[in-house]
Amino acid sequence: MAFDPAAFRRQVRMLLDRYAEEFHVPEGEHALLRRQIAAGDDIHSRRTFPGHVTTSALVLDREGRRTLLIHHRALGRWLQPGGHYEPPDELAASALREAEEETGMSGLAIDPWHRGSGLPVDIDSHRIPARPERGEPEHWHHDIRFAVRAREHVEVRPDPAEVHGAEWRGLPDLERIAPRAVRNLRRLGLVDL
């Protein structure tokens, strides 16, 4: 089945509406993404500016006490695994694929809460610096985030082409990076803080 950009925009708009209702997101929080959807921008394409959809995985251990962070090569920061959305993936599958690629881990799984709700745990739009060597101006990533569970005793083998390293960290480290995501995870009972 061919990818339909208009259907993808409708899907993201409906997700935004349901997410905003579930998590009491203030009006205007995702104004740029909503404007891009209304304008018919190809938000699925990493070449669409001023912003496009990315997905990320909030990788948690089984107890919900630790998170796996990667040291992002291009940004030089510790972040949750994630990357550009690639059609025709489902959004959650995109986040899972990115986590597996960047960490080299197998046996990761989308948290069961997502199957019941059909929602991400967070949607965050954040500024990305220009990368002239890639022909990319400063722009925005509209990051759709999913909780992902790791099996016990799975070896982490980060992809050196993508990341400098990967480490299990305490949840306060994730909270510094993605405070609203951790607040939502806590509200849903998915973490033990």
PLM ranges: what are they?
Residues 45-80:
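N-terminal strand-loop-strand
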Residues 1-2, 193:
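Basic/polar N-terminal segments that are highly enriched at the extreme N-terminus
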Residues 86-182:
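Unchanged
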Residues 177-193:
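Charged phosphate-binding loop/patch that engages nucleotide di/tri-phosphates or the phosphate backbone
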